[in-house]
Structures are given as structure tokens and as C-alpha cells.
């Protein structure tokens, strides 16, 4: 039987320098961990009002220029939302575009 040779990337093992987790058994939980090269993740969760798990947390990592990037996030009955200076924000719509949208919606 023919088996093509597949080369595997040579990944360096990155050590986990801290790893903490808890689960209270009532839907409340949390975790955080950090790697030796600066990745840091933390989150906490609790039961939501509609049967879902609500979770909020953040992750940080080092960019190639040496600065730290951070993203904070929330997920609940309203959906997933992330906040970070890294995430582009849309430019405000001009007044004429907003008026066109309102007019189009009124024509439905």
C-alpha cells in the first residue's frame, strides 16, 4: 500500500509556567494559565439566565515588535463580544447614508 511521506513541522515545546483551574460544581468555573514565552489566558464563568454559560476573560501575547497585545471577551445571552485596540472599528456612517437606511427600512 502506498503511503506518501509527510514532513511534520519542527515545533519547539513551550512550557506552561502556571495552570490554575476550578469548577465549583454549580456552574461557576475559572481558569488561567501562562506560558514561558508570555501567552497569558484567564477566564471565569457562571450560569446564565437562559441556561447558557456566561464567560468573560482575556488573553495576552507578545507581538513581534515586543509590545503586548490583549483581547478581553464576554459571551452571554447577548452573544460574543471582544474588546481590544487590535480590533478595527468601523467609521461612522455619514448622515445621508443613515437617512437612506431609515428610508429603506420604512419601505418594507
Curated annotation (Swiss-Prot):
Residues 26-91 form the Chitin-binding type R&R domain. The modification Pyrrolidone carboxylic acid is found at residue 1. Keywords: Cuticle, Glycoprotein, Pyrrolidone carboxylic acid. One of its GO terms (molecular function) is structural constituent of chitin-based larval cuticle. Glycans are attached at residue 89. The keyword Chaperone does not apply. One of its GO terms (cellular component) is chitin-based extracellular matrix. Arthrodial membrane. It comes from the Eukaryota. This is Cuticle protein AM1199. It comes from Cancer pagurus.
